[in-house]
């Protein structure tokens, strides 16, 4: 056997295990055993999750369990389980808290301010029967075939409501999430959180920097450190609000002042609400860059069905990363720009499919 034949034989022997491994994965991927595919992907080591809305990444069972546990801190929650027609005609059906929205969660203080008729529409979260508890959990899942973008954007956070204003509950959902990620081999996560004020059990305001300290304390716990998952945060603004520019100024400064915890600014909210168009924020960002250096931008864009140039306009804002980017393929010039460029698109497999 000459040298070339020996070399060929050597490489065949060397590569056989890799070929066999590739065939093995292809067999699982293309087969009918979906459980085997899920199990394989679950235990496969992973780098990181760069696009994660913390309050949108909590299983309903976790929300229920952790919300009840907050009684130890003095928090009590109620949820709306029936409609008794307590209000007259002419209410705002498009408000953040529409009267007809079931399973909206409120604090004990909010409950105390209701009249007797509306109090009868609510039950303590701890007192739900099995049917109500199941419906409560389904209310924050996309579990019906007709549920999609509208259900998600118009009811999910509106229902969570008071639960998202508790900074300790936020920290405990973080720990639950990190534990789940550690179990499937994740090593890094970036969570998107808001910068609104939080509240204590007596209704006292807990400012954002105090909430950051609560997150720091949670991450410093030994059992959390031992998980081996690094967590950082982006501060997000709701881009279509009338005061979105002021929100942007605030979170930009907070990210600059808390580099140990915060790594960037994001803009979220329905992109099909045209009041949040990207170019709206260009003057504000130019102003902010003159005051603060090194603040990174990772911004939702291209999360709509219609062809448009929102991804390009978002890159113009200075974003390094694009969230979703679903309609990027309809913008040929920007596709060419990004083909060899330094930009990253965060592909969100589940939400891109469902929303």
What residue ranges belong to the model's regions?
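Bacterial N-terminal signal peptides that target proteins for export
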Residues: 1-8
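Short amphipathic alpha-helical "recognition" segments used for binding
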Residues: 8-10, 350
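Cleavable N-terminal signal peptides of Sec/SRP-targeted secreted and luminal proteins
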Residues: 11-15
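N-terminal signal peptide c-region/cleavage motif recognized by signal peptidases
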Residues: 16-20
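Metal-cofactor-binding active-site regions of metalloenzymes
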Residues: 22-297, 303-344, 349-355
